[in-house]
């Protein structure tokens, strides 16, 4: 079973999902009408969160 948690990414509620050896951060940008997913190995979860918090989409 996956472990799902809500975290803040750029002022938006995002999902942090962990299952097995994988982790994923996902959220929607309603202004640009896009859905963003960043995934990687579970041991790099903190790095994935840092990337998500600093991501700029234009």
Indicate residue ranges for each PLM-predicted region.
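Short, solvent-exposed recognition patches
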Residues: 1-31
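Surface-exposed amphipathic alpha-helical segments
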Residues: 31-58
